[in-house]
């Protein structure tokens, strides 16, 4: 499946992201909840989220527990109406030097664990930035969370060497996962 992401990348405002997501038809999209709501009235976005969820699988990108709180609130208020909530936890994106550490997963898990059953995600995924990418992914995998690895987030192997290609990162991760 092709997954389209609507992250702002420091370039696109929420109106541009909403316009893109409204016009395309793809099986799977990811939406950074904090970015899509920037300068938007959340209640006014209910029809947008309804249309998006009707035509695509939607993965909500969460950079911290505050994003998780916001998403949970939108679901609770029926602004986002879904029976199958999917989230992507992003570790290290807004940390010093975009470096992630496995303990950055803790606030996400703590918030998730206090949610009522109907607000818990059906599918969780993680990506992590910097040299800590693989240690973070290993921690997440041990919690039953799907992992996303690649050069977009980090180029370092667990031994500190720079990977020659994405396949080297994937192999390093797979080799370290329990059988």
What does each model-identified segment do?
Residues 157-179:
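C-terminal helical cap(s) of enzyme catalytic domains, especially alpha/beta-barrels
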């Amino acid at each position: 499946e092709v997954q389209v992401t609507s992250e702002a990348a420091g370039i696109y405002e929420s109106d541009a992201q909403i316009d893109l997501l409204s016009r395309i038809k793809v099986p799977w999209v990811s939406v950074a909840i904090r970015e899509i709501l920037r300068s938007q009235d959340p209640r006014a976005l209910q029809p947008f989220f309804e249309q998006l969820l009707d035509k695509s699988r939607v993965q909500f990108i969460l950079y911290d527990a505050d994003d998780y709180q916001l998403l949970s609130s939108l679901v609770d208020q029926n602004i986002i109406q879904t029976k199958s909530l999917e989230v992507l936890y992003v570790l290290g994106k807004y940390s010093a030097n975009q470096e992630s550490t496995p303990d950055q997963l803790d606030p996400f898990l703590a918030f998730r664990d206090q949610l009522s059953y109907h607000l818990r995600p059906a599918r969780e995924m993680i990506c992590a930035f910097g040299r800590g990418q693989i240690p973070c992914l290993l921690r997440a995998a041990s919690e039953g969370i799907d992992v996303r690895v690649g050069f977009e987030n980090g180029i370092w192997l667990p031994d500190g060497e720079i990977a020659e290609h994405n396949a080297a990162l994937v192999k390093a991760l797979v080799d370290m996962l329990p059988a």
